[in-house]
């Protein structure tokens, strides 16, 4: 739960909402096939459905009120992973801040798989 203090009171935004915004920002970037989830039982990476994107996003709120975001993605073959990662970081920072007012400490992108 992300908490934002304003002059009028406190705003609480669920991790699911932040994850949905983050996942939508990431998957809108060219070359991203989808969000990824690594199964603990078999160790395989799974492509997540759009309704389950939050499993591929990890959000940490720090004591200072800012947040760190980790994204696990699957990309299409033949794309420049560095360029995709930079675009994702830019999109996520912009959209999360625009929609929630959250201060972003860091956005880390993990390319877990390449799929056709």
Give residue ranges: language-model regions.
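Glycine-rich active-site/cofactor-binding loop and its immediate structural neighborhood
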Residues: 93
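Contiguous, often N-terminal, cationic amphipathic patches that form binding interfaces
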Residues: 1-77, 81, 86, 98, ...
């Amino acid at each position: 739960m992300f908490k934002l203090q304003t002059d009028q009171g406190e705003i609480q935004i669920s991790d699911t909402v932040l994850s949905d915004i983050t996942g939508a920002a990431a998957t809108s970037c060219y070359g991203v096939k989808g969000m990824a989830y690594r199964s603990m039982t078999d160790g395989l990476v799974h492509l997540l459905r759009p309704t389950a994107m939050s499993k591929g996003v990890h959000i940490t709120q720090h004591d200072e009120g800012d947040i760190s975001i980790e994204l696990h993605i699957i990309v299409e073959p033949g794309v420049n992973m560095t360029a995709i990662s930079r675009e994702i970081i830019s999109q996520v920072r912009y959209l999360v801040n625009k929609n929630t007012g959250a201060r972003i400490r860091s956005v880390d992108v993990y390319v877990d798989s390449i799929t056709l």
